[in-house]
A protein has these predicted regions:
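An alpha-helical appendage that flanks or caps ligand/catalytic pockets
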Residues: 4-33, 54, 145-181, 221-349, ...
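Glycine-rich, proline-tolerant flexible connector loops at the mouths of alpha/beta enzymes
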Residues: 60-78, 97-98, 130-135, 216-218, ...
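Hydrophobic faces of well-ordered beta-strands that scaffold small-molecule active sites
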Residues: 3-7, 59-61, 91-94, 122-126, ...
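Acidic (Asp/Glu)-rich catalytic clusters
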Residues: 50-54, 79-88, 111, 115-122, ...
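A conserved active-site cap/scaffold subdomain adjacent to cofactor or substrate pockets
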Residues: 197-219, 223-224, 229, 243
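Active-site mouth loops of central-metabolism enzymes
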Residues: 27-43, 95-105, 186-196, 250-253, ...
């Protein structure tokens, strides 16, 4: 199991005002932040990413827009800085919200450029984007997945074509001459990732051989992984753990109490992330008819719910760190505690090859974040690399 550190790079000083307004995203005015303070935080967060390279961790960066929960507005921009400040860490963009961008060829150019700059260390996430990203992108949710798959195919073709310009005449994108310079070091393309938490996502990723990742989804991850493995077998190949990724909040300390304290602070991201004005939570057409029917049948739920290992639902907004641990969205304690929790999780999931380590969030201090990264990198991550493939998967 490889470990990829990430942080949302939040502007947490504005959270109290956003919570009072009932929305931290889309319609929360930027007058509630101090640009100089934002700059100080961004430089601090970049220092924490650089530390990962020193302790043997890989790095993941994501992006969001019009929100106090994430100040990374451009994955390529952040990764270009990190690529210059690191030497060995692999760098994952998770990801590029291609359905919300008008320029998939530009995405391919940016990723190829980063692959050259980093010496071939880039991995590429092509993601759908959250529902509250639709309004800032001025995007049509009803056509989202059609745009996504066309952009996906165009990005991959642009990255992998080296024999001269090709034209593209699609439903949403038209180009006379696609011919990206420079081309990526990793051929035909750097590794491609997708994200989601549904069986359909698992099947779609398996059909393309992509890595599939899921964020803070608890038990919902296992059916997606199983669907991936099943579809791969139907297509005549075996999907190993290296095709599966899982993102979780992790707090490590010299004592169990210290680890839980750090995890509890980081978990404030999960408690605040769903706080968005209702019109932006489920834009018409964003979810399928079947998904909307299922949500209606489940009854009114103002915020996304997850369940613990006994099927008991918890509310993100009010859950304790112990409740989050019961859902396996949080792992916390001493290095031994965290390793044993992740080892058991890996066994239950049938083998997960990539751990996305949410190691900083909320008001966690710079010193706490550095200690969390260092302890995990030195005392947990090396042992995770030695985890064996669960028996039931190895036998398939």
């Amino acid at each position: 199991m490889r470990t990829w550190y990430f942080s949302e790079m939040a502007y947490h000083p504005a959270w109290e005002k956003g919570l009072a307004r009932g929305s931290l995203r889309v319609n929360f005015p930027s007058e509630n932040m101090d640009p100089r303070e934002a700059g100080t935080l961004l430089n601090r967060y970049l220092d924490e990413f650089a530390l990962c390279d020193e302790v043997g961790l890989d790095i993941m960066v994501n992006e969001h827009h019009s929100t106090a929960t994430c100040m990374t507005v451009s994955v390529p921009m952040a990764l270009s800085i990190i690529a210059r400040e690191t030497k060995t860490a692999r760098l994952l963009s998770l990801g590029n919200p291609i359905a919300n961008r008008p320029d998939p060829v530009r995405v391919a150019e940016e990723m190829a450029w980063l692959d050259c700059l980093s010496g071939g260390r880039i991995e590429i996430g092509l993601v759908k984007g959250a529902p509250y990203e639709i309004a800032p992108a001025n995007s049509n949710p009803g056509r989202l997945m059609r745009r996504y798959w066309e952009a996906h195919d165009l990005v991959i073709k642009a990255l992998s074509t080296t024999t001269g310009p090709f034209s593209w005449e699609g439903e949403f994108y038209q180009y006379r001459a696609v011919n990206i310079w420079p081309r990526p070091i990793q051929q035909p393309t750097p590794p491609i990732w997708m994200t989601g938490m549904s069986v359909d996502t698992g099947i779609a990723a398996a059909e393309r051989g992509h890595v599939v990742g899921t964020l803070l989804s608890g038990g919902l991850a296992k059916p997606m992984y199983e669907a991936y493995r099943k579809r791969a077998r139907e297509l005549g190949w075996t999907a190993g753990p290296d095709r599966m990724a899982y993102a979780a909040i992790i707090g490590v300390g010299n004592t169990r109490e210290e680890g839980l304290r750090r995890a509890n602070i980081i978990a404030d991201y999960v408690r605040t992330s769903p706080v968005v004005a209702e019109p932006f939570t489920n834009p018409p057409g964003y979810n399928s008819v079947a998904a909307n029917v299922a949500m209606l049948k489940a009854g009114p739920r103002p915020h996304r719910m997850i369940t613990d290992r006994n099927g008991v639902p918890i509310d993100h907004r009010t859950a304790t760190v112990e409740q989050f641990m019961d859902t396996e969205t949080v792992f916390a304690g001493t290095p031994d505690d965290v390793f044993n929790q992740l080892k058991a999780f890996n066994q239950r999931m049938g083998g997960v090859g990539h751990l996305l380590f949410f190691g900083q969030g909320g008001e966690l201090t710079h010193q706490d974040a550095k200690a969390n990264i260092s302890l995990f990198g030195k005392e947990v991550a090396p042992r995770l690399l030695q985890l064996e493939v669960p028996e039931q998967v190895a036998a398939e």
